[in-house]
Amino acid sequence: MTEQASISNHDVAGWRDYLELTKPNVVALMLLTSLIGMLLAVPGMVPIDILILGNLGIALCAGSAAAVNHLVDRKVDLKMARTFNRPIAKGRIDPTKAILFAAILGLAGMAILMVWVNHLTAWLTLASLVGYAFIYTFWLKRATPQNIVIGGLAGAAPPLLGWVAVTGEVHGHALLLVLIIFAWTPPHFWALAVHRKEEYANAKIPMLPVTHGEAYTKIQILLYTFILIAVTLLPYATHMLNELYLLGAVVLGIGFLYYAVAMMRNKNKNAGMDAFKYSIVYLMALFVVMLLDHYLLPTNIVS
């Protein structure tokens, strides 16, 4: 697994390689939260043009940021089994072409948001793109073990972007959705970092388990899980959502707590990966429950 081996690989890039640059699984989760952010913003249905063009613009910008991440991390990716086969790291896509691809996606996404959605959504999306692709990827990721805590704000933006795409303004309820994802990010990524600790250490990425040890990281995961559970109660406490959401948030939160405690007990070497996988299901399910509550038990509070 050397950079020399990667450079000597001259496989022709296919469309799947360019799709992989956009991190489609990550973008899909972001789009779920942006879509639900849109739907929560109004009592009825979102205008179909905003629904389609808003999410398209957000997706293109997210894909652009992901491509920049692939580009910047190409040497790091070679040192990690999880990322060794990425298209730029393996030499299937030339860095220059990757830059052009990222620029086209970003410009297209911004144009769509500016012209057919609204300027506030476009500027907030640009801020999120810059936050992830440049501030996090270029600097924070290599600078501090708190990288994903600080940088997590960019990844937490999609529900706000969706909300603003519909309403044209920032609402407190939209910020609650951001806060939920912001609180979810540390236990989500640190669980993976515990499982992949040796790879991060080999790549010289100062993830928390590398700099402070697994035991300390597991305590932090448990603490952030409690914070996350508390934060997820706020939509009910502020009358944004109702009892159906409260029940779902509590049940899902107990599940997250179970996996955090399982990591603390050190009885399963795959506990970190199990927690990581559950955290993805958790976020998806939580936002779906929000949507069900919104339509089945409308509050008529949102303006």
UniProtKB/Swiss-Prot annotation:
Please give the name of this protein: Protoheme IX farnesyltransferase
Q: Where in the cell does this protein reside?
A: Cell inner membrane
Q: Which PANTHER family match?
A: 4-HYDROXYBENZOATE SOLANESYLTRANSFERASE, PROTOHEME IX FARNESYLTRANSFERASE, MITOCHONDRIAL
Q: What else is known?
A: Carbon 2 of the heme B porphyrin ring is defined according to the Fischer nomenclature.
The residues that cross the membrane are: 26-46, 48-68, 98-118, 120-140, 148-168, 174-194, 221-241, 244-264, 278-298
- Main subcellular localisation: membrane
Give the pathway annotation. Answer: Porphyrin-containing compound metabolism; heme O biosynthesis; heme O from protoheme: step 1/1
Q: Which UniProt keywords apply?
A: Cell inner membrane, Cell membrane, Heme biosynthesis, Membrane, Transferase, Transmembrane, Transmembrane helix
Annotated CDD domains: PT_UbiA_Cox10 (cd13957)
Family to which the UniProt record says this protein belongs: Belongs to the UbiA prenyltransferase family. Protoheme IX farnesyltransferase subfamily.
Q: What class of enzyme is it?
A: transferase
A GO molecular function held by the record = protoheme IX farnesyltransferase activity
Tell me which species this is from: Saccharophagus degradans (strain 2-40 / ATCC 43961 / DSM 17024)
> Which GO BP terms, alphabetically?
heme O biosynthetic process
Keyword Transmembrane in record: yes
The GO cellular component terms are: plasma membrane
One Pfam family assigned to this protein is: UbiA
Q: What does this protein do?
A: Converts heme B (protoheme IX) to heme O by substitution of the vinyl group on carbon 2 of heme B porphyrin ring with a hydroxyethyl farnesyl side group.
Catalytic activity, EC: 2.5.1.141
Q: Which NCBIfam families match?
A: cyoE_ctaB (TIGR01473), PRK04375.1-2 (NF003349)
The record describes its membrane topology as: Multi-pass membrane protein
